[in-house]
Amino acid sequence: MGSTGLCFYGHCIVMFLLQMVTASSEPFIVNGLEGPVLASLGGNLELSCQLSPPQQAQHMEIRWFRNLYTEPVHLYRDGKDMFGEIISKYVERTELLKDGIGEGKVTLRIFNVTVDDDGSYHCVFKDGDFYEEHITEVKITAINLQVQIHVHPPNTKGVIVECHSGGWFPRPLMQWRDRRGEVIPAASKSHSQGRDKLFNMKISLLISESFFQKVICCLQNPLTGQEERTSVILSDAFFSWNRIWKMILGIILSMMVVSIFVFSCLLHHEHKVCKWKWDAPWIKGLLIMTSSMVTVVLVMVYLHMKQRVPVSDVHFELDTLWVEDISVILCSLMVPATMLVSYTYFRLKDWCQHNHAQRVFTSN
């Protein structure tokens, strides 16, 4: 009876130990944060994961990594943090909070978040040969409160307004709006990234008329929806140069018309031609000057309408000034050049007719 009792107690102890081993290696899954976790640039990031069902995890290996299992962001093994195995860019930047490790819950804290911290993080719990993981997606956000607007000097094509802002991540939505909030089509958009991988944004707007008295530059972070904006009010004075330029061209063209009329009258008076004949000198002179004026006007319109340089190019203003100078030069030279050509044509024609008449007279 005594030996039977000892065997019974021994069997109970063995069963208890087996139950303990089975409980300690109970299968589990790893739960964590669902959906993207947003973190501000330069701040701290906390990522949590927990075993289900809850159980103590002090004896387990807990590994956080990004792309490669062998390159841990943080590693916990044999009841301690293995700082020597952490990859270089996370050295002294991570901490594993283990207050709830008795229930299988840990939190990874990352200090001084950078753009490079954007992406996926794997949390792996390993117990012997059994392991499970949870993947958390991290999105880094950065905004710049400074949005600058630069207004260029007006030219014949209008006023160029540029908006600049740097230090954004990810690339923000950037657009122009009027005072009613409606979107204004931009002339150009561009962006660049520095070594810190932050986006530098630039958007340009060419305003040819004073219709948009107030323009607003808006930038919006696509993840947080946070928006920064600044505005500028353009008075009619910005567009006065456009009216002055049209007035100058109008005066020059008027002088050209008057010159054509005067020159035609002189030819008419000189040759005493009273009838409207297509071979009359004054009509030929009028046709020469009219065709010259039409040609110059067409060339000017072509130069002004053709966009050789985009608005965002640094040489856009230089190109516009070149067009203005060429237009003035063409208008200024057209009248004397056309009159000189006409005068030379008629003088040569008279000289040829005079020589022909002399040869005919001599032969007779």
Swiss-Prot record:
Residues 1-23 form the signal peptide. The chain crosses the membrane at residues 247-267, 285-305, 326-346. Gene3D superfamilies: Immunoglobulins. Disulfide bonds join 49-123. InterPro entries: BTN3A2-like_Ig-C, Ig-like_dom, Ig-like_dom_sf, Ig-like_fold, Ig_sub, Ig_V-set, IgSF_BTN/MOG. It is found in: Membrane. Its main location: membrane. Residues 24-246, 306-325 are extracellular. Expressed in skin and thymus. May act by engaging a cell surface molecule on immature T-cells in the embryonic thymus. Plays a central role in mediating key epithelial-immune interactions by being involved in the selection of Vgamma5(+)Vdelta1(+) T-cells, which constitute 90% of epidermal gammadelta T-cells. This is Selection and upkeep of intraepithelial T-cells protein 1. The lineage of its organism: Eukaryota, Metazoa, Chordata, Craniata, Vertebrata.
